[in-house]
């Protein structure tokens, strides 16, 4: 397991992707002086006569309540326990680990006022496999992700529950298993740990990474569909894309051209084809996939900025010694980014579903049998697989409606406008699951269509993709139990097998990165 040495403010998307894939993260030691200086400022304020929010006061609507110095530790402990109000399914371990890493990065900026040992506790938990049990539901994305982060923090103090080696155990037991002891929270430390956008941001980043992988898969299956339908590659020419100028469109057109290069199917109908133009789902792939790519690139910038941000409250300004209340905990940028990712996921599924429908329809598929079965009538072929794709697309279309506009006041109207970033980000994973199935169905249908075009074959890159599919799913000759085929195809798509096969066949990586 690799370890990333994080310089808060300069952590990259590649770094975050590595954490999501299982790497650990530690703070660059050069950041400890600012961390310790901010903690000293908080410790001094806790002993002073002036009220400072979250240090010697209550929280939220109770901010006017003064807390004496001898009760500040109890104040922080009570805050954590009272805010462990999450409900619903457990958050996936990869997302929780990413959330923990994001909190380390944020605290490491030296503007939160926590002691070094608090960050070191999080680092050790991450490195030693202590994964807090964090329910998915309960955050409205302002004031930060209070409930989810409280469940994380509870384990740090020996409360709550955590997974260790796949077992759910009490927090204190999880720490002991990892050779750790509970920490006692000092002034402001509980507030700094739970007041932030790290839960929403972790979920949104995970959704972004999955969306990018699915975009690459959709370019591959889109290219397969072009050959299966004996469609034209002329709309993918670089001159067409350059005249519009969008970077994503240019990149998508280039990928489609590379994937289809050398196709004998394409050469077989360069002349004498009576069709003047192909349907939009085939012809406009650079425009649609390219727009999705540009949107994902934009959201990547937003989420990487947020990953490096300090999003708790109040904040400690080490240079001036001030402790200032602000609103960095409001996750509106994350909510907007998640809503945009949802649009990309929905549209990639929408156009894929239309390509599936084109290929199974004998009126549109240019000579292929109905539903791509050699014996239509006796066999139904991919008839209901297409219906499943339509059902999944309809679900994603509904889920793509924006969450960020659905604010509701909380905390006795003190927190009267919230972002709903957590819900916006969480729903991306259901959408990604649906999209993987849609693209998987297109993979099955397009591969079948190409194989029915014998004696003509597709390009070397796409032949390699079909070969990777056929290791797991044979061609459909007669009707069989289809659910297993669909599940295997979705797993192939989600696992990045299509992009890997194409990349290996081409000897280079044709797929665009984010940014």
UniProtKB/Swiss-Prot annotation:
GO molecular function terms listed in the Swiss-Prot or TrEMBL record: histidine ammonia-lyase activity
Catalytic activity: L-histidine = trans-urocanate + NH4(+)
Entry-linked CDD domains: PAL-HAL
Metabolic or biological pathway: Amino-acid degradation; L-histidine degradation into L-glutamate; N-formimidoyl-L-glutamate from L-histidine: step 1/3
EC top class, as a word: lyase
5-imidazolinone (Ala-Gly) crosslink, residue number(s): 142-144
EC code(s) of this entry: 4.3.1.3
InterPro entries: Aromatic_Lyase (IPR001106), Fumarase/histidase_N (IPR024083), HutH (IPR005921), L-Aspartase-like (IPR008948), Phe/His_NH3-lyase_AS (IPR022313)
List of residues that carry 2,3-didehydroalanine (Ser): 143
Post-translational modification: Contains an active site 4-methylidene-imidazol-5-one (MIO), which is formed autocatalytically by cyclization and dehydration of residues Ala-Ser-Gly.
Subcellular location: Cytoplasm
Keywords: Cytoplasm, Histidine metabolism, Lyase
GO CC terms in record: cytoplasm
GO biological process: L-histidine catabolic process to glutamate and formamide; L-histidine catabolic process to glutamate and formate
Pfam family, one: Lyase_aromatic
Family: Belongs to the PAL/histidase family.
Name listed for the protein in its UniProt record: Histidine ammonia-lyase
Organism encoding this protein: Bradyrhizobium sp. (strain BTAi1 / ATCC BAA-1182)
